[in-house]
Amino acid sequence: ILGAAPTAEEGAALVKSYQEQGILVTLVGGIIDQCIEQNVKMGASLRVIPLGYDVTSVIHVVSVAVRAALIFGNVKPGDAAGLMAYTKERVPAFVNAFSPLNEVIVAAGAGAIALGFPVLTNEDTFEVPGALIPKVAPADMNAASLDARNIKIKITKIDIPVSFASAYEGEIIRRGDMQVEFDGSRVDCCELVHMKEPGEIEDHKIEVIGPDLDEFEVGSKHSIAYVVEVAGKSMQEDFEPVFERKFHSYINCIEGVMHTGQRDMIRIRISKDTFNAGFRLKHIGEVLYANVKNEFAAVVDKCQVKVITDPELVTKIRHEIAVPMFNKRDERLATMTDEAVDVYYSCIMCQAFSPSHVCIVTPERLGLCGAVSWFDAKATNELDPTGPCQVVTKEKPIDERIGEYEDVNEAVRKFSHGALDDVSLYSIMEK
Ligand code: SF4
């Protein structure tokens, strides 16, 4: 975004709209002060990056686009035509330039257009179809920009008073910024998905049992349990832990909320800013409800959420329901052997940050993270057959003693994009 919007409110709203869609936004010129004025948090981890006040600082983001072509597109230095073809086709970037435009901004905009990035402006100037789109009101810029680049975004609109976006996933809430904390290492906490009969569930019922955030002292620690009850014709108990593993990501996507851990070892911090914006416990329920219904629509017909902070009730839920349930799941796996199954599963969930990483998950061999069991991988595959966990056959043994199979090696080669040739499941000494 180049220049200042007509008002600071409009500028900040545009920036936040992109941030909520998971789009990286870089800022040049007056828009930076507008964001500061409107308390928009900025930084690389929040995907809103101020580059500088002078229009020439736009070169930093051009550099990112060019490097994308060199690194990921294998474009050779000096191949200008190949570079421009790559950025046009593969780098879904665009420019929003606010009026008044001067010659330097126009020159920078022409450079963007040459790379295939359309420029949208609110200035009343001439149009170059698909390249320079004038007279776009600030409120329409988001939709017009996505349209110009044919970007389709699946958004889950959730009724909460703060933003919900993957940009907030790595956000750290420091003790001094924290309104309250729920800490499973000190008090009883747990998170649980429980399959029920359809008649036992009232869809979208969010219940808070116990004191809410405004009844806690600033900086205090408390117990929490949230139980997500689901029902559906194709729902299976095996899917419960798969949903639970996603809670970490869902809750972290809330602006000003930090979540770590899983099962009964969780910690959640809620920031003062988020509390002051009106965030309360029912909103945790809203986030869990919306995401479970959205992501697992194929198997979840009805969903209700209970958020419990009554300490005695949380202790009861943790020890009498959650822990026995976790133990039952673990015991089921503990009695299974690799020989007892016909197939293993691959998992590439970590390729988001480690592009050639692949795990082969077997009953006796969890994924590297320790959080994906053979049952979890199986359920993930059933829920999303083209997703991160794929069936790996084990029909062509090379050496069963060290767990080497031709078909497992083939899978490892395929999913690591050739970075790994083979794997022995039981030995790091011999192979
Ligand atoms: S099983 Fe492997 S790839 Fe999958 S989430 Fe765990 S560490 Fe990552």
Give a label for each model feature.
Residues 45-46, 52, 67, 90-94, ...:
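Extended, intrinsically disordered, low-complexity regulatory segments of metazoan chromatin-modifying
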Residues 4, 13-16, 25-26:
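Glycine-rich beta-alpha loop segments
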